[in-house]
Amino acid sequence: MSKIIGIDLGTTNSAVAVLEGTESKIIANPEGNRTTPSVVSFKNGEIIVGDAAKRQAVTNPDTVISIKSKMGTSEKVAANGKEYTPQEISAMILQYLKGYAEDYLGEKVTKAVITVPAYFNDAQRQATKDAGKIAGLEVERIVNEPTAAALAYGLDKTDKEEKILVFDLGGGTFDVSILELGDGVFDVLATAGDNKLGGDDFDQKIIDFLVAEFKKENGIDLSQDKMALQRLKDAAEKAKKDLSGVTQTQISLPFITAGAAGPLHLEMSLSRAKFDDLTRDLVERTKVPVRQALSDAGLSLSEIDEVILVGGSTRIPAVVEAVKAETGKEPNKSVNPDEVVAMGAAIQGGVITGDVKDVVLLDVTPLSLGIETMGGVFTKLIDRNTTIPTSKSQVFSTAADNQPAVDIHVLQGERPMAADNKTLGRFQLTDIPAAPRGIPQIEVTFDIDKNGIVSVKAKDLGTQKEQHIVIKSNDGLSEEEIERMMKDAEANAEADAKRKEEVDLKNEVDQAIFATEKTIKETEGKGFDTERDAAQTALDELKKAQESGDLDDMKAKLEALNEKAQALAVKMYEQAAAAQQAQAGAEGAADTGSTNSGDDVVDGEFTEK
């Protein structure tokens, strides 16, 4: 069975891992980094992903960041003169990760396990699966990020029973999951979270502070300047990271804008104490889901054996201190918070292929599911933190006499009124026989699969007629749209490969021209004019092809030049070898002469008087 890669598709950074033997290994990107910025930019018709895209974010307005925060919505992003869905942008990131995983493995990759925040709703999960499909990946499993982290942490501890709390604060989302580990079973007891809390919010607090201070000093609002804002974002992210290791950092942004008197510079120092003060409310918000998860799991703090920190934002000292204060435990630092989720996803891939034995993953649904009933009430059929996959049925009836149809309004959430929860979809069961209200028996069945994706069935028990739908939110993509986007993604991949081939050829041509010109110059007057003239002719032909830009012609002329240049090089080598041989012969003769010179010596006679 082909390898199943594990992908952590993050808000700020993404990572890809693969199982090698029994070990999960992070695959470095082409720049040698173990995580890849979740950034996509467009330039001259080219799609740029990762580090290169992030580097040009300041100067390129066609750059998209933090797209994960828009997953599961109908919001589109404008770039490159087009509008893209969040699924399409995410697919570009996935395609890039897939590409360098294939380079590393030396084989095609078609299957993946992709992680999502535990608190992602059905629409967001479906959007993630669609993004994988567009990228040419069969998504074998959607796994919750804290659960994946627990897999990576606990794989070598399957003989030990313990309860762990996973505190996962990423770039844009926050989750807390409580799991019980033992005998190879990873059982999620409860999960809670906040999909609108992450490292981006900490960055924003610094940005707001810098904007306010600069406005106070210079009377100019930098938040209205897109380029300045991107520079502020980069500086804020760097300052946040710096303050995890030092107590004070300098923020220096020369020529940030211009005033009436000329260019203005932003120079400010930010202390860790000030940063903690700015972000205090965000740190406080992390405490509520911790308490909620413990309550839902029915556990006290004393029953938690380990606290695992996941996500780059857990490096913030105030966050670490808050976790210590809230749990009464020193966090376990045995896992890399940036890499552990992708590693866990790869392990789950190994479970699917059978390479990892005796491991069972029991995940839960993060939010309650149900339907709208009379009076706009939300009636739950499946409670949050129910182990998945699961199925639950309940019988309902009509609200009016002779009602011919019932509308099934499917919802996800925790609020008592339907209007306050997230609509997953609507469908209708028709042709109900005329009868007084309360008589028809309508059975509604909810199914949640292992990926947390919902399907709903309504059945008239009297006529046995039923209606069944897999929930596709109003913000989701149709099969036709996914198909079109897949073709676009494939076309882009082909175009990118062709563009790379073109660049490589042009570089090869430049190198060949430079090397041949150097050789021709060095061989002037050395006696092999035939080969030099042939190389010069081939060189001139290649230069003409280079000017025309015809790739096929360039390729043909490059081969011709290489042949002539090779012939010239052979002649040079032969001449050099002959000269070396002649020199060696001359030196040998000289040595022989000096050895024989003793034969001409005449002995003199000495007479004593």
UniProtKB/Swiss-Prot annotation:
SUPFAM superfamilies, A to Z: Actin-like ATPase domain, Heat shock protein 70kD (HSP70), C-terminal subdomain, Heat shock protein 70kD (HSP70), peptide-binding domain
GO terms of molecular function: ATP binding; ATP-dependent protein folding chaperone; unfolded protein binding
Residue numbers of Phosphothreonine PTMs: 173
Keywords (A to Z) from UniProt: ATP-binding, Chaperone, Nucleotide-binding, Phosphoprotein, Stress response
Recorded superkingdom: Bacteria
One Pfam family from the record: HSP70
Segments of skewed composition (Acidic residues): 600-609
Region of interest called Disordered, as start-end residue ranges on this chain: 576-609
Bias kind Low complexity: ranges: 576-590
Induction per the UniProt record: By stress conditions e.g. heat shock.
Membrane-traversing stretches: none
PROSITE patterns (alphabetical): HSP70_1, HSP70_2, HSP70_3
Function, as annotated: Acts as a chaperone.
Stated family: Belongs to the heat shock protein 70 family.
Name this protein carries in UniProt: Chaperone protein DnaK
